[in-house]
């Protein structure tokens, strides 16, 4: 079976080596690590489909939260990660690279954002433009936390995601912890549901969120200003974040904080997998795999609105729209 050398994806392209394999035995087993948020799931589904149908691989997927999945990746238990939020785990990721546990395979999604958001109607009505504007009792009451009387609620990351601890530290540095809880919604789906449900009911929203996502194209959220991203400050803050992750919230020490950086999302492979000659074509494919943020957003919107929650159908839809589906089945 032949596979095209280069296929254009909007303004980016995926280079795919020719495939001589027609059976799982020719490729062998590939163990992908996946996370509990939709954009990672889309990439895992697309890559998994190509590996199975195009390269003849036997694909296994293990899905979970950031810390355990990345730990398993560093421990050579998971071969490939297709969406790494590198700056959120920068210390342990760089240590893993330096120790020769993984190799980085370049950029997947060129641009992503994350931060604190308020729904536009509330932001406009009360003049909420920055995190400092949130530090008023009358504003906190708009976002009342039913489980913490006297405080507002900011719906945050899930506790197994590093951004939950980053947000915890930011709350303390910015003084938001006096007015708001850093609420763990329990899952990425519950976070989406909390935001979408509030919009449907016309209720105020104060939440952490990010792009690329399908939901962001459906709701009108305003990102609050924070101190501008500063690499030196971020490094200091992340040292505190890692201490808290290891030893608990009481390990917090005074630090600075800044906005999340506009981040390029990356890919990586375990060195055990990457160093096998038989895996070279797979590693070359993953290295070349890159999807622009708008295409990711469109795929996520399809997943949410048209696929019936079927991630494989979403992958096939994406591949069909880019001309790749027919090539895979040549």
Regions found by a protein language model. Give the residues of each.
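Short, well-ordered beta-strand elements
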Residues: 27-39, 57-62, 151-155, 286
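Short, polar/charged alpha-helical segment
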Residues: 38-57, 169
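Ligand-binding "clamshell"
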Residues: 91-105, 202, 216-254
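Pocket-flanking alpha-helical
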Residues: 44, 62-100, 194-198, 214-219
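A bilobed periplasmic-binding-protein/Venus flytrap-type ligand-binding module shared by bacterial periplasmic
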Residues: 114-124, 262-278, 301-302
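Ligand-binding pocket segment of bilobal, Venus flytrap-like solute-binding proteins
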Residues: 71-72, 79-82, 155-237
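A conserved helix-loop-strand patch within extracytoplasmic ligand-binding domains
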Residues: 101-156
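Conserved small/polar residues in nucleotide/adenosyl-binding loops
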Residues: 329-330
